[in-house]
């Protein structure tokens, strides 16, 4: 008899990652000093957590085990993860729960708007789990969330970090029509690593998704990111930059992959701060308006400040 246990001590009855339970443990090298972060203990962190709980919301900060949660929540910055806490994909790098999700909460867009208002966010980031079980991948729900935030917080700028909507015709168009200020879709890794890291996705589909946003509405900023430390080569990272620029992506993020549990993909290497700095320099020479590359860079880390820089960079080009 096989005993199924929750590898994150969630519950012995329902594994958080059932597809990973019987995998052998993978070993990652010890974290270097530049990766260490402080435990979250501040009053601002507690206030943000309370607002999230009061509105019954899920955040990617918690679900994905983001190392920056203490810093961001202390400043009352949170990234809302909508459409539930269970993803229909099973990416090898991700700590979000996998399985069959619950039905959508029709009141969620209003709850997100209310939390955005209570936190006083000048810039809000909304992401989601993949919902391959829905005909439109949840696109209408994301669009409704954008509209709800606009109605409640008209001066707040909105960034969405979306799934790939693979085989979901018309889904992307619904979100673009809702006019987020930033459309983010992460490539996550280089093409050669997709089969082992992101097997449910298709690299060139994701590139085309980003390109299509610009074709529909060139005024929307586009953004994408990758993790390093998954076994990629430097020349592959540079090729991803070129592919993104061919799709007119404005903003690139590059961060260090950190292994959530021993059942997830191992960290193959830790990229040094100097290497990240070099990636950033090269990316700017390729034409990105904004680049964030560092060991702890994540898609929504410093998103508000980075949006202001992104807008200023485009305004400068228009002069």
Swiss-Prot record:
Pfam families: Radical_SAM
Statement: the UniProt record of this protein carries the keyword Iron-sulfur: yes
Pathway: Protein modification; protein lipoylation via endogenous pathway; protein N(6)-(lipoyl)lysine from octanoyl-[acyl-carrier-protein]: step 2/2
Binding site for [4Fe-4S] cluster 1: 61, 66, 72, 300
GO molecular function: 4 iron, 4 sulfur cluster binding; lipoate synthase activity; metal ion binding
Keyword Metal-binding: yes
Ligand binding ([4Fe-4S] cluster 2): 87, 91, 94
An annotated GO cellular component: cytoplasm
Cofactor detail note: Binds 2 [4Fe-4S] clusters per subunit. One cluster is coordinated with 3 cysteines and an exchangeable S-adenosyl-L-methionine.
Catalyzed reactions per annotation: [[Fe-S] cluster scaffold protein carrying a second [4Fe-4S](2+) cluster] + N(6)-octanoyl-L-lysyl-[protein] + 2 oxidized [2Fe-2S]-[ferredoxin] + 2 S-adenosyl-L-methionine + 4 H(+) = [[Fe-S] cluster scaffold protein] + N(6)-[(R)-dihydrolipoyl]-L-lysyl-[protein] + 4 Fe(3+) + 2 hydrogen sulfide + 2 5'-deoxyadenosine + 2 L-methionine + 2 reduced [2Fe-2S]-[ferredoxin]
Swiss-Prot/TrEMBL keywords: 4Fe-4S, Cytoplasm, Iron, Iron-sulfur, Metal-binding, S-adenosyl-L-methionine, Transferase
EC numbers for this chain: 2.8.1.8
Location of the protein in the cell: Cytoplasm
Span list, region Disordered: 1-28
Disulfide bond sites: none
Residue ranges annotated for the Radical SAM core domain, each copy included: 73-289
Cofactor(s) this protein requires: [4Fe-4S] cluster
PANTHER family from the UniProt entry: LIPOYL SYNTHASE, LIPOYL SYNTHASE, MITOCHONDRIAL
Membership in a protein family: Belongs to the radical SAM superfamily. Lipoyl synthase family.
Protein name: Lipoyl synthase
